[in-house]
UniProtKB/Swiss-Prot annotation:
The gene is hslV. Its EC number is 3.4.25.2. It is found in: Cytoplasm. InterPro entries: ATP-dep_Prtase_HsIV_su, Ntn_hydrolases_N, Proteasome_sua/b, Proteasome_suB-type. It catalyses: ATP-dependent cleavage of peptide bonds with broad specificity. Pfam families: Proteasome. Keywords: Allosteric enzyme, Cytoplasm, Hydrolase, Metal-binding, Protease, Sodium, Stress response, Threonine protease. Belongs to the peptidase T1B family. HslV subfamily. GO terms for cellular component: HslUV protease complex; proteasome core complex. Allosterically activated by HslU binding. The active site is at T7. A double ring-shaped homohexamer of HslV is capped on each side by a ring-shaped HslU homohexamer. The assembly of the HslU/HslV complex is dependent on binding of ATP. This is ATP-dependent protease subunit HslV.
Length: 182
């Protein structure tokens, strides 16, 4: 059976603000199944934001597991991410899940993969999914050459990715946190 897939998730950290945004398109093979999916969410008392790329059902399973890890570790992002990655790598059922998570709190931004990787990216810029390279290129150019806010960079870069990538649309969901975690 074909997987639901294709998306773009972008996270930018600038100043005291971190933002994660994503498009709303869900694709099955060559067909757009839904155009307004929410692939970015607030977790753990609204102190963590997370987005996913990959299989939709798989990602929802991982969101639930990640939120449980956040609860278990009192919202400590890095510890929860490492514990989820351990489970993901070693659990026979979880290993089959095909998704990548981008997560952030007021202090750290991370990529969590099914290979058990927890990666803190350079320059706190995360771009995942089929439109990730387009969004990353646009965001880097905007970060280096403008004074735009993190939210404005995410909006503009995702719009550019949506104009280029056939698996990405311009129906955006954007969540932001400042240094107080709000």
């Amino acid at each position: 059976m074909e997987q639901f897939h294709g998306t773009t998730i972008l996270s930018v950290r600038r100043g005291n603000q971190v933002v994660i945004g994503g498009d709303g398109q869900v694709t099955l093979g060559n067909t757009v199944m839904k155009g307004n999916a929410r692939k970015v969410r607030r977790l753990y008392k609204d102190k963590v934001i997370a987005g996913f790329a990959g299989g939709t059902a798989d990602a929802f399973t991982l969101f639930e597991r990640f939120e449980a890890k956040l609860e278990m570790h009192q919202g400590h992002l890095i510890r929860a991410a490492v514990e989820l990655a351990k489970d993901w790598r070693t659990d026979r059922i979880l290993r089959r899940l095909e998704a990548v998570l981008a997560v952030a709190d007021s202090k750290a931004s991370l990529i969590i993969t099914g290979n058990g990787d927890v990666i803190e990216p350079e320059e706190s810029l995360i771009a995942i999914g089929s439109g990730g390279p387009f969004a990353q290129a646009a965001a880097r150019a905007l970060m280096e050459n403008t004074q735009l806010s993190a939210k404005e960079i995410v909006q503009k870069a995702l719009t550019i990715a949506g104009d280029i990538c056939i698996y990405t649309n311009n129906n955006l969901t954007i969540e932001e946190l400042n240094d107080e975690g709000k």
